[in-house]
Amino acid sequence: MASSLLAGERLVRALGPGGELEREQLPRKLRAQLEAALGKKHAGSDNATGPRRLVSFRLIRDLHQHLRERNSRLYLHELLEGSDIYFPEIVKPPRNPELVARLEKIKIQLANEEYKRITRNVTCQDAQCGGTLSDLGKQVRSVKALVVTIFNFIITVAAAFVCTYLGSQYVFTEMASRVLAALIVASVVGLAELYVMVRAMEGELGEL
């Protein structure tokens, strides 16, 4: 976290002999602290202009407060021209080898569990697909048997009607009587065939 400023040349000159801050009658303690901060140079390899002068925010606040109390025409932002906020380099602590190894182990376990979960879903889907195909084959065979049964039912009823109609000509002379007799016989045969067909379908559904 930033807590200091990299003092610019403007602030250094203002605090020096004959500088702008000389006539502001800075408190002795504040001047001494500022001179100590600006006189203490901090080496830094990332600074191309040479050693760095660091001034804490607390000293900057004290300086600002003093200037405001004196109603000075010298403003803080003018003194801070060329200054920058100093961000200290964050030193990362060394990682614990045991902790790193434990984290890697946990990552591997989580990856294995995720892989097993994915492959388990795929296996279940394959099994369901195989079961669906098997059930589909049974359903096709059942539908085929049902179609054959219905076809036989229609043929049987039609044959009963035709045979009765042709045979009743020796008993009835009127066509209406012959048709009625043929319908009665065909209905009886149809009901019998329907009963047998329903029982057969119940047996097949029970097997499914």
Curated annotation (Swiss-Prot):
One example GO MF annotation: oxysterol binding
The keyword Transmembrane is annotated on this UniProt entry: yes
Main location class: membrane
Sites of N-acetylalanine modification: 2
Topology versus the membrane: Multi-pass membrane protein
Disulfide bonds: none
Transmembrane segments annotated in the record for this chain: 146-166, 179-199
Superkingdom field: Eukaryota
Localization (cell): Cytoplasmic vesicle, COPI-coated vesicle membrane; Endoplasmic reticulum-Golgi intermediate compartment membrane; Endoplasmic reticulum membrane
Keyword entries, A-Z: Acetylation, Cytoplasmic vesicle, Endoplasmic reticulum, Membrane, Transmembrane, Transmembrane helix
GO biological process, one term: intracellular iron ion homeostasis
Record-level GO cellular component terms: COPI-coated vesicle membrane; endoplasmic reticulum; endoplasmic reticulum membrane; endoplasmic reticulum-Golgi intermediate compartment membrane; lysosome; vacuolar proton-transporting V-type ATPase complex
Function statement: Accessory component of the proton-transporting vacuolar (V)-ATPase protein pump involved in intracellular iron homeostasis. In aerobic conditions, required for intracellular iron homeostasis, thus triggering the activity of Fe(2+) prolyl hydroxylase (PHD) enzymes, and leading to HIF1A hydroxylation and subsequent proteasomal degradation. Necessary for endolysosomal acidification and lysosomal degradation. May be involved in Golgi homeostasis. Binds 20(S)-hydroxycholesterol (20(S)-OHC).
Subunit structure: Accessory component of the multisubunit proton-transporting vacuolar (V)-ATPase protein pump.
PANTHER family in UniProt: TRANSMEMBRANE PROTEIN 199
Protein's name according to its UniProt entry: Vacuolar ATPase assembly protein VMA12
Record organism: Mus musculus (Mouse)
Encoding gene (name): Vma12
